[in-house]
Amino acid sequence: MNRLFFSKIALWLLDFLTFNISFLLSLFVISYYHNGYEKYLPIYEIDDRTYIHAVLAGICVGWFAIRLRHYTYRKPFWFELKEIFRTLIIFAIFELAIVAFPKLYFSRYLWALTWGITFLLFPLARVLVKKFLIKSGWFLRDTIMIGSGDNAFDVYNALRDEPYLGFQVTHFISVSNISNNVKELNIPILNSMSSWTSVTKKTDQFIIALEDDEEVDRNNWLRYFSTNGYRSVSVIPTLRGLPLYNTDMSFMFSHEIMLLQMNNNLAKLSSRILKRTMDIVVGSLAIIIFSPVLLYLYFAVKKDGGNAIYGHPRIGRNGKTFNCLKFRTMAVNSKEVLDELLRTDPEARAEWEKDFKLKNDPRITKIGAFIRKTSLDELPQLFNVLKGEMSLVGPRPIVIDELERYEENVDYYLMARPGMTGLWQVSGRNNIDYNTRVYFDSWYVKNWSLWNDIAILFKTMNVVLNRDGAY
């Protein structure tokens, strides 16, 4: 417990120091490039400005601690990052008002540089320190999973995908049936009161992740934890399929009823305009930045005599067909090569019928293998984005034959423009099965937000650089 307490103190001190270091670092940068900072901050005001910034740092850290509970509750990385940026924006505007109204000397350059460094340094420092604390074992929390079914397995995977939470699942406690997925994890599974009380502590994190038909067991566990002094208990009900990101929650007084107000953000005109604006602005900038790469690949692919770019029919928003642009990565006679392979190789035919992809595809050219591995074959889709046929982020563009495989989720797919990248691309790409791809596409549409798009774009950069799941 002491280690966890000191981890909280370390995070608190780090945030306070980072906040102040950003101001001092901005003064250093200005001094280095402008032979002193007096032009941007008079010497007689430096003490006042340092004091103001230090007070703001204390208030900001207090806000993180008391209102947002960043040092007591553990939150998923992207959710916490959104709260950090939102808070820093508020405090940046607040400092602007404090400095401007008392008629202190105000430099927009110093203000912008200070907060620009803060926005960069603050989350980076959080990640690095959490990474260090987890690696040293100080921030790790032994976690006991109540349940051993599909819900418990889903929760385990979610925790594994959020390493900075520091939850380390050490045991499962079985209530009824044990799923094969849980068995394959090789994590101890306990099934009696005496067995789990002897290996756990009241300070451990307990997560109740039972199935819908185990409501009685769930209530019994909650009653036991509440009456026996267990404080770190979380309940994760089975809510698969609900649009949780856009849900407002309220409670009925004196009733054990929770009201979830569902909101479909992509159905709002304002949300669609916002998403389209980001597509146009970011897409245009990307074309300008990557224009040398586009030109080089165009001529490199064209060397074998075929077209460098081809358009393949895909299903877009509202079922409208469009030509999805890509650099050609296959031989000119790729159709004949595929037909012959499927006719003579039963294993390849089975793989193709399952996922419409081949891991060892003989149609791919040498330059094609490179640009596929680096995902550069999809760069021409930036023009699809500008035309309004695609979005930077969205469901994976599919052919018409794949629509039937979406079954009841097909309406979600048709609600949004297909994306150059999406949850599928940042979650394993070709290494995941088709049903999981469908799940990711429907989850994205149901839970859309501009912040999710930004998070997926940053995740895509990491995937492309590491070449995860591409072939």
UniProtKB/Swiss-Prot annotation:
Record carries keyword Kinase: no
Subcellular localization, as worded in the UniProt entry: Cell membrane
GO molecular function, one term: phosphotransferase activity, for other substituted phosphate groups
Family annotation (InterPro entries): Bact_transf, EPS_sugar_tfrase, Undecaprenyl-P_galact_Ptfrase
Record's bilayer topology term: Multi-pass membrane protein
A biological-process GO annotation: polysaccharide biosynthetic process
Enzyme type, top EC level: transferase
Pathway(s) of this molecule: Glycan metabolism; exopolysaccharide biosynthesis
EC number(s) from the headed UniProt entry: 2.-.-.-
Keyword Oxidoreductase attributed: no
Keyword list, A-Z: Cell membrane, Exopolysaccharide synthesis, Membrane, Transferase, Transmembrane, Transmembrane helix
A single Gene Ontology CC term: plasma membrane
Pfam families, alphabetized: Bac_transf (PF02397)
Transmembrane segments: 10-30, 46-66, 87-107, 280-300
Chief site of localization: membrane
Role according to the record: May function as a sugar transferase.
NCBIfam families: EPS_sugtrans, WbaP_sugtrans
Family per record: Belongs to the bacterial sugar transferase family.
Protein name as it appears in the record: Uncharacterized sugar transferase HI_0872
Species of the source: Haemophilus influenzae (strain ATCC 51907 / DSM 11121 / KW20 / Rd)
